[in-house]
Amino acid sequence: MSAGQTYYEFYRGSSIGTALTDALDELITQGDIPPQLAMRVLQQFDKSLTECLQKGVKNKTTIKGHLSTYRLCDDVWTFVVKDPQFKMEGVGAGSEMVTGSKIKIVACKSGDAADGKKAGGARE
């Protein structure tokens, strides 16, 4: 990890993040790894998943729904959308529509924007 660069930890709450955390907890409990190593693994997970999503996701998704709640706290936006409809383009041949009852979207500043640099397409 680059010095001074921090990554958000909210991907640890995903299914793969939870599985990793459970596996690391088991290894610590069995005495196979020290807790410091587990923390380094989780920090690398945060970094790797963030970079993978930034560089690897090229599909476009449009979300429509009813905005139920929104909040800004410490430069983190949280939106709760009821009855969302996701239209995903570039998935197979054409586009795919997925619906749900409620979603929570958490939006954070990118690394460039957090450092005060202008992010691609963002206005200050």
Curated annotation (Swiss-Prot):
Segments forming a coiled coil: none
A Pfam family it matches: TFIIA_gamma_N
An example Gene Ontology molecular-function term: TBP-class protein binding
Compartmental location: Nucleus
Superkingdom per UniProt: Eukaryota
Entry keyword Ribonucleoprotein: no
Signal peptide: none
Entry GO terms, CC: transcription factor TFIIA complex
GO BP term, pick one: RNA polymerase II preinitiation complex assembly
Keywords, alphabetical: Nucleus, Transcription, Transcription regulation
Subunit and partners: TFIIA is a heterodimer composed of the large TOA1 and the small TOA2 subunits.
Recorded family membership: Belongs to the TFIIA subunit 2 family.
Function: TFIIA is a component of the transcription machinery of RNA polymerase II and plays an important role in transcriptional activation. TFIIA in a complex with tbp mediates transcriptional activity.
Protein name (Swiss-Prot/TrEMBL): Transcription initiation factor IIA subunit 2
Organism this protein belongs to: Cryptococcus neoformans var. neoformans serotype D (strain JEC21 / ATCC MYA-565) (Filobasidiella neoformans)
